[in-house]
Amino acid sequence: MADKIIENNQVSMMGKIAAGFTFSHQVFGEGFYMTELLVKRLSDSEDRIPVMVSERLVDVTQDYIGEYVEIHGQFRSYNRHEEKHNRLVLSVFSRELKFVEEEDETVPVNQIFLDGYICKPPVYRKTPLGREIADVLLAVNRPYGKSDYIPCICWGRNARYASAFEVGGHVLIWGTYPEQRIYETDRGK
């Protein structure tokens, strides 16, 4: 099962390591560590993407800040229990990590494919700049009865199309993983 390719959740990205490795957790004696990857957008701005890596893929005691890597893996989520509420934590789970000399234009810089099911009715809205977007929450199944719950944003005509999706509907999504800063607001509470 360890080498089974999970086809419904695939991420490929390349970027520069931007942080040291910090311990996350251990499973059956295997340590997992978090780092951050700076990944360029087409606009040349950069996203800081959290990446989880096994100690079996890389020597986590070394300093690799500034090194370029190519990563293939999955998009994962889990609920972090905080004082009065849960917080959905999103990261890329690296199944393969390869050091590269510099950015290689033949490698997808930031590509994601998800095959899952709609969890909540999509929310269609317009941004303050008038752009149409739809918020979609997708459940992507993985082995052993687990699922990753991944919030997605559809833009433009795709937003109008996605706004009609029904809960339980099967959806295939291709896109990128941009860094998202989510700010909580007081909604009349």
Where do the model's predicted regions map?
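Single-stranded nucleic acid-binding surfaces, predominantly the OB-fold ssDNA-binding core
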Residues: M1-K189
